[in-house]
Amino acid sequence: MTPGHAALIAVVDDDEAVRDSLALLLRLHGFATREFASGEAFLEWAGTEPADCVLLDLRMATLSGLDVQAELARRRLGWPIVMLTAHGDVATTRAALKAGAFDFIEKPFDGEVLLQTIRAATQRSAERRTQAEREARFARDLERLTAREREVLGHVLAGRHNREIAVLLDISPRTIEVYKARIMDKLNVDRLPDLVRLALEMGLGRE
């Protein structure tokens, strides 16, 4: 979901009446939908558009919801999945949640509960997309660092002070300060603690 665009929900259910009622409910509440009568049809489409949530029937005639979930994981499509389950289908529901499903809704579903769950799932999707964009931007910014700047950054993340880094690199502490300023400028941060926090969040500096 991007600003000004409705969140896109993929509805996957082999029961036409259920599929149509779900799509209608979602569209009436501002969501865009794509409907699929089978797991195979959905998987053929998956990846052609970025879905914000997948509403997935657990038990279908051919590919099951668990099968579809496993294939999405194999393709690294991290869309939040809300499983539609029959009442009492506890063991399979537990398996879906253990495999990473966002939540489940029992049939016959309560419209308001379903909408609340979908909104929470699309919020998760938006957060993941924002994080992915931050990571991509950081990776691009990191490419701008020189080899020496990367070396200095590594020492900073290891907790070393200017004098220690200066001795290790055989340069002056003042030069270390210059390198730090350049690094912060290239990585778009204003303070050293913010630089350290950002780098650690992005996976740098870990043993």
Which residues does each predicted region cover?
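Conserved acidic segment of CheY-like receiver
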Residues: 3-18, 22-26, 39, 54, ...
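The feature encodes the CheY-like receiver
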Residues: 19, 61, 85, 89
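Acidic catalytic/metal-coordinating carboxylates
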Residues: 37-38, 62-68
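Active-site beta3 strand of CheY-like receiver
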Residues: 49-55
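C-terminal output helix
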Residues: 89-91, 105-118, 164
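Helix-turn-helix DNA-binding segment
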Residues: 136-174
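Basic, Lys/Arg-enriched C-terminal extension of HTH/homeodomain DNA-binding domains
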Residues: 181-207
